[in-house]
Amino acid sequence: MSLPFSLSVAARRIEALLGDLSRFPWKTTAQTLRERFRADHLGLTASSLTFTTILALVPFFTVALAVFTAFPIFGQLQDALQGWLVSSLVPDSIARQVLGYLTQFAAKASGLGLAGFSVLLVTALALILTIDRTLNDIWRVQRLRPLGQRVLIYWAAITLGPLLLGASLALTSYVMSASGGLVKRLPDGVRFLFDSLQFMVLAAGMALLYHYVPNTPVRWRHAWSGGLFVALCIELAKKALALYLGRVPTYSVVYGAFATLPILLVWIYMAWVIVLLGAVVTAYLPSLLAGVARRGTVAGWTFQLALEVLQQLHRVRHDAGKGLRAGQLAQLLRVDVLQLEPVLESLTALDWVGQVSAVVVAASDPPEPRYVLLADPQSTLLEPLVHKLLLERSESLGPLWDKAGLGRLQMADVLAR
């Protein structure tokens, strides 16, 4: 009786999953990706990251080889990592050539002195800091982590990342080889899990990137959604590029033996576009699932949103909940959380709004602070907010300020009665 029960449970779960997929706002997601790609100039950003990546490839590879060379016991991990890079991140048509060039360059770079190695290390860190700034821009984060903290975190990622990744891949290779052919006789579902390791490693890496790099709370389920999006698109892009190069060998005909370089440039650009779009998916997934109805394209939108935030915080000032989280404000105002970030930072800078007692929404997610109204509406002039978000007071605008009475308005005048 357990088998029919298990099948029925699986059928219900599959049906629920298909229902969720059918209700997902695919059209709105595509529109958001198109809008953000154009408005945030992600194509130009991907070009910049492509150039920086080309400069940083050899430094990254040199640091990774230095780590493995310093610990000869990890030689098998190095082979596993190189094999994964060849089969997962680069199209087959150029993978082995690129790996051969990188190994050759890195071997020569390892003979540099301290000054030369420092230059390579700075180049590698420059790429990482560029990624950090780009992702924080997508999440509309105004305040980055301290530079020293970022450098320490990313240095640890550069040195320990290859070891951990190589260890996981080598362990799987060992299981496959030590099984004596048993793995080949396992059920198709288990074999599929082994075959999907490369896909999941890439998805997990992207999820870690989207969860930890932005200096703002990012839920794990949203980060994993972005990671799976990137892994799927990378696989599709690899197959599409391989198909194109096989059917239309333009680069090989024109460039001959040098065709690897332009193909590598095209691939790195495509990969960065996918990674940036994955970040957009992760950042905007909360608003997409919530069905945001207000995009805020009119002039003065930020000022209007600030007034609405003040009204909502004033409404709950005596409630036992002690303020509202950014997600709650976004839901009440039917806007994207990312639109609220600069507004809340402006109100906090004016000391009108404060953060209190971070709340853990889910055990696996970072705590979210609550925002409370600190200013007294009866004695606080609205002029600083008007000056900051709407209209600066200048000599030419003085008559408008005086006749409109903008300098005399108090916060209480714009709050709901």
Swiss-Prot record:
InterPro entries for this protein: UPF0761_bac, Virul_fac_BrkB
Family named by the database record: Belongs to the UPF0761 family.
Protein name in the entry: UPF0761 membrane protein Veis_3782
Cellular compartment(s): Cell inner membrane
Chief subcellular location: membrane
Keywords: Cell inner membrane, Cell membrane, Membrane, Transmembrane, Transmembrane helix
Bilayer disposition of the protein: Multi-pass membrane protein
NCBIfam families: yihY_not_rbn
Transmembrane feature ranges: 54-74, 111-131, 151-171, 192-212, 226-246, 261-281
Pfam families membership: Virul_fac_BrkB
Keyword Cell inner membrane: yes
A GO-annotated cellular component: plasma membrane
Keyword Iron: no
